[in-house]
Amino acid sequence: MMKKTDYITTEDFSKEELLKLVDLSLKIKACIKNGYYPPLLEHKSLGMIFQQTSTRTRVSFETAMSQLGGHAQYLAPGQIQLGGHETIEDTSTVLSRLDDILMARVERHQSVVDLARCASIPVINGMSDYNHPTQELGDLCTMIEHLPAGKKLEDCKVVFVGDATQVCFSLALITTKMGMEFVHFGPKGFQLNDMHKEELDKICELSGGKYTVTDNEDAIEGANFLYTDVWYGLYEAELSEEERMQIFFPKYQVDSQMMAKAGADCKFMHCLPATRGEEITDEVMDGPHSICFDEAENRLTSIRGLLVYLLRDYREKNPYDLVKQEKAKEELETFLKPE
């Protein structure tokens, strides 16, 4: 059996590995679009730990397991305590014996890191206060499907507008790793910080990607993809709605004027859920340049590929495993034979 692989951050994967994962995801998507559901996860069980509520993440993981022949178990907030009454070590050890793979959407990034360290099965980060790596994969699938004619990924410019959320940082990680140009256009005090920049510097040195952090709206010009997220994600408890609006509105609202400034062929992306009338207008969200609902569908696309990628590698059999399997099958059939 091969050593297990976790998916905690894309920083642990090479560009080639991530592109292979996306290629696998899109191939499975094509199969399903044509009516064939490959049973690649037959008899596999996914344990889903949620410290935070979710729509797209939960539905995508449950649907992915079901479509590929497996099963998902939803462990809701309050049903399981990571490091509470039971230690993370004990929780991960037990779930490793009951499931084939785990996904955790956690409040603190260290919780999913500790879970992966203690588990003997693969662990996926479904989002933490540090990053959102499954969103990254869906975004990469979407950008590849909507590449401008004649351009490669490394020719493209991606601009994130607004607050430095986990999604903003995750988008910066995946785009710079692909050798793309990334821009964070946001107000001072709500931009990617020195820790983020240190990580991005390391990636760009190897990939040839580049990034800019600015509050100058001219940085939007020439964008191939314009991306935004909600304005209250990180500061909901600290800032009132009125304070948030004073900081972000109207300069950082993606509207038709901003899209025009980016360029005629620019596509609009949003991780959802969106607050229409705040970070995004109805006109752009529902307009011809919006690919945010394709992006939402590709959460499922990429999660199918990720589950197969991690489980197929981890569960790869050798001839001795097959011999043991046949022997166990014979013993069970003998036991069940009527006397």
UniProtKB/Swiss-Prot annotation:
Keyword Cytoplasm (UniProt): yes
GO terms assigned for molecular function: amino acid binding; ornithine carbamoyltransferase activity; putrescine carbamoyltransferase activity
Predominant location category: cytoplasm
Example GO BP: citrulline biosynthetic process
Covalent S-S links between cysteines: none
Protein's UniProt keywords contain Transferase: yes
Pfam families referenced in this protein's UniProt entry, alphabetically: OTCace, OTCace_N
GO cellular component, one term: cytoplasm
Name of the protein this chain belongs to: Putrescine carbamoyltransferase
Residues holding putrescine: H270, C271, L272, P273
Role: Catalyzes the phosphorolysis of N-carbamoylputrescine to form carbamoyl phosphate and putrescine. Is involved in the degradation pathway of the polyamine agmatine.
Record-marked site positions (Important for structural integrity): K29, E145
Pathway: Amine and polyamine biosynthesis; putrescine biosynthesis via agmatine pathway; putrescine from N-carbamoylputrescine (transferase route): step 1/1
Reaction catalysed by this enzyme: carbamoyl phosphate + putrescine = N-carbamoylputrescine + phosphate + H(+)
Family the UniProt entry places it in: Belongs to the aspartate/ornithine carbamoyltransferase superfamily. PTCase family.
Keywords assigned by UniProt, alphabetized: Cytoplasm, Polyamine biosynthesis, Transferase
Top-level taxon of the source organism: Bacteria
Amino acids binding carbamoyl phosphate: S54, T55, R56, T57, R58, R105, H132
